[in-house]
Amino acid sequence: RKQELMNLNELMKARFVELFGDPIKNPKGWDVVKLSKCLERIDNGKSFTCDSNAREGAFPAILKLSAATYGDYRPYENKALLEETQFVESVEVHRGDLLFTRKNTPDLVGMAAYVFETPEKLMMPDLIFRLVTNERMTPIFLWQLINNREFRPVIQGISGGSAKSMSNISKERLKNIEVICPPISEQKKLEGVLEQVDKSKLKKLR
């Protein structure tokens, strides 16, 4: 299973490079803009007191950092809330969201996960941002860009923090990074491929 998932992830990455080239060297000459020009907003998660165990059924729960750390969305990585009444709708995760780990170990900080499907009543912790793009960029394009191997040093370069064990990325620093911004029609070419890939991936995970 793991091997199949790795192969599918490699296929996603290869398609991105095929369409857009190296996002740092930018051999195709795409426009380069600050990320802030492509974002409508960045939403914060929230800090909760929760159980150490995963939820049962649709009981409200908070995602663990590992739900968005490895490039794909893992809703089963969650911790149940202590009380159902603690649920906060504004930080619930929805289909189509792009999650970004703002705090993590230095090598894993600033990874992104796109939400193709999600069970209800799962919420973002305060260690995760939701990146909401505007009409200039698709969330799927930004997801693949952030996790692109050549682009990782840019993300890691804006992380800070005194502790060697944990790095942190602020909204302001994130908004100021420079990104390639191909025409939206080009960006959308990724979507057909990736949605098919992710469906087959979900079947293998069941």
Per-region residue spans from a language model:
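Contiguous mid-protein beta-loop-alpha structural module that forms a pocket-lining wall or clamp
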Residues: 2-5
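Non-catalytic DNA-recognition/assembly elements of restriction-modification systems
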Residues: 7-46, 176, 181-206
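Short coil/turn segments at secondary-structure boundaries
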Residues: 28-31, 48-55, 158-159
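Sequence-specific dsDNA recognition surfaces
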Residues: 36-52, 66-98
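A short beta-sheet element
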Residues: 64-65, 88-147
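A short glycine-rich beta-alpha junction/loop motif
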Residues: 121-129, 137, 160-188
